[in-house]
Amino acid sequence: MNALTAVQNNAVDSDQDYSGFTLIPSAQSPRLLELTFTEQTTKQFLEQVAEWPVQALEYKSFLRFRVGKILDDLCANQLQPLLLKTLLNRAEGALLINAVGVDDVKQADEMVKLATAVAHLIGRSNFDAMSGQYYARFVVKNVDNSDSYLRQPHRVMELHNDGTYVEEITDYVLMMKIDEQNMQGGNSLLLHLDDWEHLDHYFRHPMARRPMRFAAPPSKNVSKDVFHPVFDVDQQGRPVMRYIDQFVQPKDFEEGVWLSELSDAIEISKGILSVPVPVGKFLLINNLFWLHGRDRFTPHPDLRRELMRQRGYFAYATHHYQTHQ
């Protein structure tokens, strides 16, 4: 098995015409595609979902799929297959999504509706214990006293996968920028597993398949530890990861040293992408073969960034991990 997968240069068909949105490769990598909903599509979508406040989407989970169908219908039913094809394609698996005209914090509810529609065209977003909803909104400020690196602005949040400390499978992660004030820096950091120079070394190490304990801090509202290996394989035998440096709890010297070396090898990778995400845009990535993090911010007394996340599972046939369910 070859752990590395070449990028397909023709992954995006430049001659393809889509209804309601455009699709182009990003400036950072052909693996990351930029999808932009047209002004007309955005306007029509927001008009058609205006009758449902965000609270309705929280209380009635089937409405999340309803708004997804509305968006897909406005795109001539080309959106859903395109999203699934991209996210399941090992050579891509990541989208930066934008809706023309949705770019102000005053439109925060509209942003949640749009992101919810997109997410529920590919699967379903899991319950987020930190917020008590299917999504979480949180703020990064200049001073932080929380119990994880999620809100700490003046340091790099290291690359990781989401869903490492919960039992639910986390196939996708959606990260949306709702507001930003007095900000410099803080780009999203992404690393595709197949662009990581040290993948083969760590994937083939005996420690790679050893179940390890993952435990979350109190702010996550998750009290039960979970056990799983850092690496697994998909149905085609390709490496996937469930890893975060903050929450893995090595049981002994051997595990601790290996995890420390693994973390260093990830952070020095030349394959890391630095991606600016303006207000109103969101990243949607395959969580099994993309790692994500955040660069540091320049200090400012009035620094503020508000983010929204959703993470969940793909709703299609058989998938997930091959060996460790």
Curated annotation (Swiss-Prot):
Pathway field: Amino-acid degradation
Record-level GO BP terms: L-lysine catabolic process
Signal peptide per UniProt: none
EC numbers, comma separated: 1.14.11.64
Cofactor(s) listed: Fe(2+)
Cofactor note: Binds 1 Fe(2+) ion per subunit.
Domain of life: Bacteria
Gene3D superfamilies named in the record: Clavaminate synthase-like
Statement: the UniProt record of this protein carries the keyword Oxidoreductase: yes
Enzyme class: oxidoreductase
UniProt keyword annotations, A-Z: Dioxygenase, Iron, Metal-binding, Oxidoreductase
Keyword DNA damage applies: no
Disulphide bond pairs: none
Catalytic activity: glutarate + 2-oxoglutarate + O2 = (S)-2-hydroxyglutarate + succinate + CO2
Annotated residues for binding of Fe cation: 160, 162, 292
Alphabetical list of NCBIfam families matching this protein: PRK02963.1
Reported function: Acts as an alpha-ketoglutarate-dependent dioxygenase catalyzing hydroxylation of glutarate (GA) to L-2-hydroxyglutarate (L2HG). Functions in a L-lysine degradation pathway that proceeds via cadaverine, glutarate and L-2-hydroxyglutarate.
Family listed: Belongs to the glutarate hydroxylase family.
Record's subunit section: Homotetramer.
Record's protein name: Glutarate 2-hydroxylase
